[in-house]
Amino acid sequence: MKYLLLLNKTLLNITSFLAPNYCGKLAVDIFSKVRRKTIRDQEKPFYDQAKKFEVAREGENVSCYELGNPDGKLLFLVHGWESNPGCFVHFLPHLSKYRIIAFTLPSHAHNKETHTNMYECKDAFKLVLEHIKPTEQFHVVAHSLGSSVTTFALSETSCQVDKLVFLSANNKIEQVFQDFQTLLGFNDRVYRLLEKRIEKMVGDKLSEMTVEERLEKVKFNELLLIHDKYDKIIRYENSEVLHQKFKNSQLIPFEKIGHYRMLWNKKVLGEVLRF
């Protein structure tokens, strides 16, 4: 892993001077590549219980899963980066009264595609919403990147949401790219090329892409934020900013429950169910 990081760093730094256009493309390719992770044994029961269906999408269809009570209140589950819908399997026995809809983010889990980004994931969620056509308020439980995907998708719809639950939410998308620069250790020239290419792709300035700004456009009643104070993937401060911004939010801090492990924590589950 360290060797690969060093190789990518060296390659990006050199090409930033010799072939800047290629460097920008290469940086985006490295950033958007999804590491293919095997479905964990504890996640497999999710797929055994679910009814699978697909929503048409250019490239590769969106794999969707329905569980629970077909006549219950609608609840969407949105997983995070390099994860899969099975990460919510621990929640299923306690959500059986709901009509649960989950979907696999592009290029994740069983998908054949290998690269994606938050905007593609956002568009995938919008396609799922268009397919389901909610007629009443619904709930969303989202983890990690899923909170951004949820926010950006809903901000571009007229959907009425009852409760939002964000587990380890991020806020500034720009921070994700800055952390990527820190991880690989490439120079500022590479970062500027990466930033320029991303902004051209999505049509938005990176510095203006924030969950707090987009969430203002979402019609929702309540927001629950749960975050580990020592989360090593997404800083706790992200949830603090969102909580301070929205009066109809509640922030519950935890310690040492991890970023992914929190999805298997009984106390976290209890707080979600109480909400």
Q: What role is predicted for each listed range?
A:
Residues V218-K219, L224-H227, D231:
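Short beta-strand/loop motif that positions the catalytic acidic residue
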Residues K2-E54:
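An N-terminal hydrophobic leader/cap segment in hydrolases
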Residues E156-D204:
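Hydrolase active-site cap/lid region
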Residues H115-K133:
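Alpha/beta-hydrolase active-site loop
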